[in-house]
UniProtKB/Swiss-Prot annotation:
Residue numbers spanned by region Disordered: 674-819
This protein's name: Metabotropic glutamate receptor-like protein O
Cytoplasmic side: 416-428, 479-503, 572-587, 646-819
Biological processes, Gene Ontology terms: G protein-coupled receptor signaling pathway
Location of the protein in the cell: Membrane
Organism encoding this protein: Dictyostelium discoideum (Social amoeba)
Glycan-linked positions: N99, N185, N277, N295, N330, N370
Biased composition (Low complexity): 799-808
Length: 819
């Protein structure tokens, strides 16, 4: 009985102990491959040791560097698979992962993120997040000290994964200070393998290493977390440095005589146990590596163990190196941090600690030191520059753009010389010149698009393209807006709209465009950047880039141009019923806008997503998109010029200038000399009222069959030919009127109303309440039959033509003619 009791008691204890333990599943997010013999290799090895010792499950994701979408998907997949302990070695995206962890702060999910100590949020609302700061400053100082001391060439190098001009260079400075502390006369060559955050490219790093070796460097340091740089040194007969914490001598023997060792297995085992046992400490301290453990510390700080093969060190230097290492091991008690106490920081930081040293935070936020023995090597020396545009595309765009500019200049000369031609005056020559000028600006912007990207061309081509389209579409919009206002005037009220009343509207649209462009340039950080071509690791090209604020400004700019296109579509729809061909540009405008919209919404928007999804940092999609934009701009502008000006040139070529005609034929009739032969015999100079009555009676006696034989019939030329009972009598202008920019003064018939020839380019509509004109009431089917009085021979002799359109009301014939 006692045995049974004790057995039950033991089982209860075991079950109780098991119930108090939490389940833990690890998900490891690696920046590169776990076979890199570097940081990723060591953390993956530590993961396997945790699995082995604690009997838990884990998953691993690799090659997440520079790819936030992949990081996001890896985190989601990890949580969906039940992982509650996520470990990240992606130092470049530590902020992104820290912010992402906030989405799960109310869940039992724990995080260990490799980053910097200043990345914890303030106020700190992430209790289950530990930030692992691998502080290798002293390790890099130690390796720089040895490299400079035993260098045979007096030159050592360093390859940084960060941008030398803009980014902090903490490890670079630590390596350099160690070098000058052992040999002040050393020459320090620095090069960056950073091409737009493409800083983990092993082939590029290998190539840069060979470049530094060719310049006499025999030791190369780097903050890259793999050994590709050291392999290049070894392949060229040099000595490798172990810079990642891996014990390279186990694999490469004497080829890596100097390194340091970091063991992460015990650290991960200890932290995982706190999750399983429920002893996780919220807002825990940051783990900082050092040469020795701090006395009395309770954290899990890995110890840096220096590894030195003294066979490669001359005896005269061995004691000096041993003394330096002993100082580093006792740095906590003696406060020996030589990388923080160099005189080079005197001109950088005014505020220091009482001992004359800067703080660790100040050192972490320091740029590359300025010293005479530091030489920066341009990383483009290893690469071949390749233009993003092929020569054939560049020559084609350049040739077509220059030819189109030449055509536009000829068109401007043509319009200026023949500005009094009827078809040109009806279309407002000044606005035609503005349209062509806008096209010239567009073609100039296209030429800049085909040139290599620089800071100036990146800014200038967008300015030219946007301003060109604003002048082109704005002038077209405002010019036809006036036509709509004048012809959509059923009550014939007087309206005077001159060019000078329209110019401010065009200028206002242009000002809005300039303001958006200024916002884009001021906030967008527009610049040219070098990017490695994805198809070749030894070629680069320049592309234009901007930040997120610049992208927002570009979206606003595109929306602004879209509104102009919609406005132009609306105006072209409203003027489609204008029955005078010289004023009706609805068809060419609609076609031009359709082509532009097709290019914008069909081609560009379809190409852009597929290009961006292929590679966010690759220059090929960017260059392809820019090429498409450039070709579309040239094509749409050239076609628009042909549509808007082709019919005008054809009319002048076939019909002549028409300087003595008040208005042209409507879209449904034409005046032909053959049609008017019967009227010419009986028509007079238009000033004799009786002769007009005779012509009227003669025309009235024509039978229906004769009317049908006429090849052309006159349709009432009104404002909009919607009603068959509305018509307007047009008085022909005098010669003085021909100096006006528009050849069609539309006036009421009321006696005493005349045309003011002093107001250039002015339309006038007068309300006439004394007369109401209708069609002939004798036959309901022939209300729109009008008689024409036109003497072709007299038009050639007189200075102005007399044109009358007569109507009949209440069976009374009334002929109105203008003397």
């Amino acid at each position: 009985m006692k045995k049974v009791f004790f057995l039950i008691l033991i089982l209860n204890c075991v079950v109780g102990a098991l119930s108090n333990k939490n389940i833990c599943k690890i998900s490891l997010l690696l920046s590169g491959d776990y076979n890199d013999i570097g940081v990723n290799y060591m953390f993956n090895y530590a993961r396997t040791q945790v699995e082995k010792n604690l009997n838990i499950n884990s998953i691993v994701f690799t090659n997440l560097e520079n790819n936030q979408n992949a990081i996001n998907n890896a985190i989601i997949e990890s949580i969906n698979k039940g992982s509650n302990f996520l470990i990240s070695t992606i130092n470049s995206h530590s902020n992104f992962i820290i912010n992402y962890s906030r989405l799960y702060k109310n869940k039992e999910i724990f995080w260990l993120i490799k980053g910097n100590d200043n990345e914890r949020p303030i106020p700190d609302d992430l209790p289950r997040v530990k930030i692992l700061n691998i502080n290798s400053d002293l390790s890099f100082y130690y390796l720089g000290f040895i490299s400079s001391l035993i260098s045979k060439t007096g030159k050592i190098g360093f390859i940084s994964t960060k941008n030398i001009e803009t980014d902090y260079q903490r490890l670079t400075n630590a390596f350099y200070i160690g070098a000058i502390n052992s040999n002040p006369n050393i020459t320090f060559l620095v090069c960056s393998n950073n091409f737009n955050n493409q800083n983990n490219n092993k082939k590029i790093s290998y190539k840069i290493s060979k470049l530094l070796i060719s310049k006499g460097v025999d030791f190369i340091g780097s903050d890259q977390d793999d050994n590709s740089i050291q392999l290049a040194v070894i392949d060229n007969g040099g000595i490798g440095l172990g810079l990642t914490g891996f014990e390279y001598s186990k694999i490469y023997n004497d080829k890596f005589p100097f390194s340091f060792k970091l063991e992460w297995s015990q650290l991960l085992i200890d932290i995982t146990n706190t999750i399983i046992n429920g002893s996780w400490v919220d807002y825990d301290i940051i783990y900082i590596t050092s040469f020795s453990r701090l006395n009395g510390t309770t954290n899990f700080t890995p110890e840096i163990e220096p590894i030195i093969n003294y066979n490669f060190i001359p005896k005269i230097y061995q004691k000096q190196i041993n003394d330096e290492i002993n100082k580093l091991k006792n740095h906590s008690t003696n406060y020996y941090f030589p990388h923080l106490c160099n005189n080079l920081f005197n001109n950088i930081y005014n505020q220091k600690q009482t001992n004359g040293c800067i703080t660790n935070e100040q050192f972490s936020n320091s740029h590359l030191l300025n010293a005479s023995n530091i030489k920066i090597i341009d990383n483009k020396e290893i690469l071949e520059f390749v233009d993003s545009y092929s020569n054939s595309i560049k020559i084609s765009i350049l040739s077509v753009s220059i030819f189109c500019i030449f055509i536009c200049v000829l068109g401007m000369i043509f319009i200026t010389v023949l500005r009094n031609a009827r078809i040109l005056k009806s279309s407002s020559p000044s606005f035609l010149l503005l349209i062509l000028f806008g096209c010239i600006v567009i073609f100039t912007g296209c030429i800049l698009f085909s040139q290599p990207a620089t800071d100036k061309t990146c800014q200038g081509r967008v300015w030219l393209l946007s301003i060109g389209y604003t002048i082109f579409l704005g002038s077209l919009l405002i010019k036809n807006w006036r036509v709509w206002l004048l012809f959509d005037n059923k009550k014939l009220r007087k309206r005077s709209i001159t060019n000078w009343k329209l110019y401010p509207w065009v200028a206002g649209i242009l000002v809005v465009d300039v303001l958006i462009l200024a916002l884009w340039q001021g906030l967008g950080d527009i610049k040219s950047e070098s990017r490695i071509i994805g198809t070749s690791f030894y070629q680069y090209t320049n592309v234009c880039t901007n930040n997120d604020q610049g992208s927002i400004a570009l979206y606003i700019l595109l929306a602004f141009h879209g509104l102009k296109l919609l406005g132009t579509c609306f105006i072209s729809f409203k003027i489609k019923l204008v029955d005078i061909e010289e004023f009706n540009e609805s068809k060419p405008i609609t076609t031009s806008v359709f082509i532009i919209l097709f290019c914008i919404f069909t081609i560009i928007l379809l190409i852009a997503p597929s290009s961006s999804s292929s590679s966010a940092s690759s220059p090929q999609p960017i260059a392809s998109l820019e090429t498409i934009i450039c070709i579309c701009s040239v094509t749409t502008t050239a076609i628009s010029i042909g549509l808007l000006f082709g019919d005008k040139i054809y009319f002048i070529t076939t019909q002549g200038l028409g300087l003595n005609q008040t208005f042209a034929k409507s879209s449904s009739f034409s005046l032909d000399k053959k049609d008017c032969d019967d009227d010419d015999d009986d028509s007079s100079d238009g000033s004799d009222h009786s002769n007009s009555n005779k012509n009227k009676n003669k025309n009235k006696n024509r039978n229906q069959s004769e009317k049908k034989k006429r090849p052309n019939s006159i349709k009432p030329i009104g404002l909009f030919s919607k009603s068959k009972q509305e018509s307007v009598v047009f008085n022909p202008p005098s010669n003085n009127d021909l100096t006006n920019e528009l050849a069609l003064p539309i006036e009421g018939i009321k006696e005493g109303h005349g045309h003011d020839s002093e107001n250039n380019d002015e339309y006038e509509h007068h309300e006439d309440e004394d007369h109401e004109y209708e069609g002939e009431g004798e036959d309901e089917d022939h209300e729109d039959e009008y008689e024409v009085e036109n003497d072709i021979e007299q038009e050639q002799e007189q200075e102005s033509s007399n044109i009358s359109i007569s109507t009949k009301k209440n069976n009374e014939n009334e002929i109105i003619s203008d003397t």
